[in-house]
Amino acid sequence: MEAEPERCCFDDWVDDWVQHARKKGVARELTGSLLDALDGVGLGGRTMLDLGCGIGDLAIGALDRGAASARGYDLSSKAISAARMLADERGVADRISFDVGDAATTDLPPADVVALNRVFCCYPDVRSLLDRSLAAAGSVYAFTIPSSNGLIGRFERIQAAIANVWYRLRRRTFGDFRVYIHDVDAIDERVRAEGFRLLRWERRRVVWHLAVYER
């Protein structure tokens, strides 16, 4: 396990995420959509690995839907502390664990279900993240990612460029964090190369793709 960073740019958003999760079960509507999609495949009795888990709302929700156990990793130590707190509040702390770690460099434990919610867009290069997460995945692999194709993909790239100017101007807060728009088709091809078949592929909130695979 890697040493905990002193501070992560995501720390500033943790309190808002927790507030929303306490009210609605999950911090974001997209997370709820991914949880519903995974529930549709079947979470009962399965183990789950949530990479870039944030405050753990997806993994905790999976336990509520019947998953046997779950584990989450995130770069933000504040988010991990919040995830542990929420798991305790929801009465599932004995079946879930959260650790600070980078999924692109950490040795990941195997799990039946591996999920990456709004994670690929935080990495300049997703090859290592794909390699490690796919190696850990048993029967289900799922992710959400910004659209990269067509007019929406162009819009996303423009929006990301504007956001990255803001992040650079606030380097003291965000460090080297940037938003990246990756080729969704290339990621889909990489996942299929590991023997997964696409079960669900849909657009959410206009600019996001949600994908669930099984093998």
Question: Where do the model's predicted regions map?
Answer:
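Conserved class I S-adenosyl-L-methionine
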Residues: 1-42
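Conserved SAM-binding loop of SAM-dependent methyltransferases across substrates and taxa
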Residues: 55-66
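Conserved SAM/SAH-binding beta-strand->alpha-helix loop
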Residues: 76
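Conserved SAM-binding loop
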Residues: 83-84
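A short SAM/SAH-binding and catalytic strip from SAM-dependent methyltransferases
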Residues: 113-125
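A short glycine-rich, Lys/Arg-flanked "PGG" loop and its adjoining helix->strand segment in the class I
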Residues: 128-139
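Conserved beta-strand signature within the Rossmann-like core of class I S-adenosyl-L-methionine
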Residues: 138-146
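C-terminal alpha-helical "lid/dimerization" subdomain adjacent to the S-adenosyl-L-methionine
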Residues: 146-190
